[in-house]
Amino acid sequence: MSYRKLGRTSAQRKAMLRDLTTDLIINERIETTEARAKELRSVVEKMITLGKRGDLHARRQAAAYIRNEVADAEKNQDALQKLFSDVAPRYEERQGGYTRIMKLGPRRGDGAPMAIIELV
């Protein structure tokens, strides 16, 4: 199985992908570099597929990966609850392809290619 190293150690890379996954579930749209967006896509697709399964084992697998952050203070909902109650039911009829990557221009500081990744 191939993956991008993203210039980090394996622990740093896993932590970054967990953070980005949680942020994407909460905000449903984030701006990051193209390489990170492409790597994030596969992780988020797997999380949404777990959400569609919806059983206890799937919920525990997702909880082991997603950070425990508040998604909506008004609904008193965290990221995991949002994944299983709001995000996953939207894609009940769709078999994969839950995200869209739109390329932006280069970043001002270092010229890194930027992209917006969002839930379809």
UniProtKB/Swiss-Prot annotation:
GO terms for cellular component: cytosolic large ribosomal subunit. It comes from the Bacteria. Keywords: Ribonucleoprotein, Ribosomal protein. One of its GO terms (biological process) is translation. GO terms for molecular function: structural constituent of ribosome. The keyword Transcription does not apply. It holds the Pfam family Ribosomal_L17. Part of the 50S ribosomal subunit. Contacts protein L32. Belongs to the bacterial ribosomal protein bL17 family. This is Large ribosomal subunit protein bL17. It comes from Bacillus licheniformis (strain ATCC 14580 / DSM 13 / JCM 2505 / CCUG 7422 / NBRC 12200 / NCIMB 9375 / NCTC 10341 / NRRL NRS-1264 / Gibson 46).
